[in-house]
Regions:
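Short acidic alpha-helix initiation/capping motifs at coil-to-helix transition points
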Residues: 20, 43, 195-198, 261-268
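Rossmann-fold NAD(P) dinucleotide-binding segment
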Residues: 59-126
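Hydrophobic beta-strand scaffold residues
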Residues: 32, 56, 124-126, 281
Length: 306
């Protein structure tokens, strides 16, 4: 492929999510120029996209120069300081009318701050929630864009083309609103997921401790639930997990794992904002506290012995 071909989209951050999104865009006819500081990730990207229009770039300047105007650049980097660092390096390379999209799990107020910082530059900024994990990124995520309204017509066709489809065939991608609206919606989405996972965990505990069911029997219950109105990704993978056995001992793998759960912060943010707004979200808050207690495994073990 000629390296002078104008590319449709720049993608910064070539982890699994970024890679899979790039393949999804390519499948829908959008040529992707990718960049990552990690040379190994760039090499893997070139390997996975061999035969496609996509290619990696060795610098942000090369990536920006490869894009057709107005430039559209999607950031898939860790939320926080990494986003600010990329923006600081990108800003001098961009022109009025270019569009930046932050696809990470960014706090919505950080997105609003970045939009304000770009006011007057003509650079358009979007904060976009991306849901569906690695498989969703590859086959069809749910996308929640918000920010500069002027950017939406410039990116809507490509974003809606790669998004998952609802039962009525409408794309799972629509404009959420100004400022940090897109990331706010994703934050609440993740908070609800915290509550869902806590309810699944408590259902498992009740069946195991109160009813005496084995993990295999509980798996069968979850599989039955997944065939009805409770059917969902989380219920389905729970059934699969509970049916998995440890190859070394033959017993249920769930009985061999450490009983601690980490968290990335979106559930906490949702709970904090609910308190600020006076919105009742006790199930989400309790799910966050349950994870906090879960993470205190040494303290729990000590307390159980004294």
């Amino acid at each position: 492929m000629s390296t002078t071909q104008a590319m449709s989209l720049g993608l910064i951050g070539l982890g699994v999510m970024g890679e899979n999104l790039a393949l999804n865009f390519e499948r829908h006819g959008f040529a992707v120029a990718g960049f990552d500081l990690d040379a190994d990730k760039r090499a893997r990207f070139d390997e996975r996209t061999q035969g496609l229009q996509a290619r990696s770039c060795t610098s942000l300047a090369e990536l920006v120069a490869s894009l057709s105007a107005p430039r559209r650049i999607l950031l898939m980097v860790p939320a926080g300081a990494a986003v600010d660092a990329v923006l600081a390096e990108l800003r001098p390379l961009l022109s009025a009318g270019d569009v930046l999209i932050d696809g990470g799990n960014t706090l919505y107020s950080d997105t609003a701050r970045r939009i304000a910082a770009l006011q007057g530059s003509g650079i358009l900024y979007l904060g976009m929630g991306v849901s569906g994990g690695e498989e969703g990124a590859l086959h069809g995520p749910a996308l929640m864009p918000g920010g500069d309204a002027a950017a939406w017509p410039l990116v809507a066709p490509m974003l809606q083309s790669i998004a998952a489809r609802a039962d009525d065939s409408e794309p799972c991608c629509e404009w959420m609103g100004p400022g940090g609206a897109g990331h706010f919606v994703k934050m609440v989405h993740n908070g609800i997921e915290y509550a869902d996972m806590q309810m699944i965990g408590e259902a498992y505990w009740l069946m195991q401790e109160m009813m005496g069911l084995s993990p295999a029997q509980i798996s069968a219950v979850f599989r039955e639930w997944n065939a009805g109105e409770l059917g969902s990704y989380l219920i389905g993978i729970t059934a699969d997990i509970l049916a998995t056995t440890d190859p070394l001992t033959g017993e249920a793998l769930v009985l061999r794992i450490l009983d601690t759960a980490a968290q990335k912060g979106t559930g906490k943010w949702t709970s904090q904002i609910a308190l600020d707004l006076g919105a009742a979200a006790p199930t989400i808050a309790d799910a966050v506290f349950a994870r906090t207690v879960s993470a205190l495994q040494p303290e729990r073990v000590h307390a159980s012995k004294h």
